[in-house]
Regions:
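Hydrophobic beta-strand anchors of alpha/beta hydrolase catalytic cores
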Residues: 47-48, 80, 127
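Thiol-/selenol-based redox modules, centered on thioredoxin-like
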Residues: 129-156
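Short pre-active-site segment immediately N-terminal to redox-active cysteine/selenocysteine motifs
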Residues: 43-46, 50-54, 123
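A short beta-strand-turn-helix
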Residues: 25-45
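Boundary of Sec targeting at the N-terminus
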Residues: 19-20, 32
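Sec-dependent N-terminal signal peptides
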Residues: 4-15
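Short, internal strand/loop/helix patches
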Residues: 23, 28, 97-132
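Structural microenvironment flanking redox-active thiols in thiol-disulfide oxidoreductases
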Residues: 60-101, 112-117
């Protein structure tokens, strides 16, 4: 009985720890260093979306969110961070694409896939919602038209 109790407590602790962001050093599209473990939003939610310039479903998802993002910001104060997994030779495509679409998201670069691996992201698009305390409350791989409603519900 004691073993079961100890194992249960260990499992709960592991789940709690894994619900926090791992700390990985990345750069934004302007060359500024960012520690992912320090990502926060003053008690408001954060969306982290892994994407790539060559990923058509990623682009559809980010364009769809772009349409509703100003409303989400007004209603929830959400902060949106998109993490490009484009490899080093393709990183120079990221900023022109973001600027071309008029996205006002924060953009981080993960050319070596360190943050992607730390978050156990297998494919893109892959989106996480963090609550105001930095805990992952929503985790979704892939994109389906209309999926923004599920994301919005996770922000509440």
């Amino acid at each position: 009985m004691k073993k079961i109790l100890v194992l249960s407590i260990m499992a709960i602790c592991a789940l709690t720890i894994s619900a926090q962001l791992p700390n990985v050093k990345l750069q934004d599209i302007n060359g500024k260093t960012v520690q992912t473990g320090e990502i926060s939003n003053d008690g408001k939610p954060v969306i982290i979306s892994f994407w790539a310039t060559w990923c058509k479903p990623c682009l559809r998802e980010l364009k769809a969110i772009h349409e509703v993002y100003p409303d989400w910001q007004d209603e929830t104060g959400v902060r949106m961070i998109i993490v490009s997994i484009d490899q080093a030779q393709d990183v120079n495509r990221v900023k022109p694409m973001v600027d071309g679409f008029g996205w006002e998201y924060e953009v981080l670069l993960d050319p070596n896939g360190d943050f992607k691996r730390a978050m156990n992201v297998q494919n893109v698009p892959h989106l996480f919602v963090l609550d105001g305390k930095g805990k992952i409350v929503y985790n979704h791989a892939g994109y389906v038209d209309g999926g923004e409603e599920d994301i919005y519900n996770a922000l509440q």
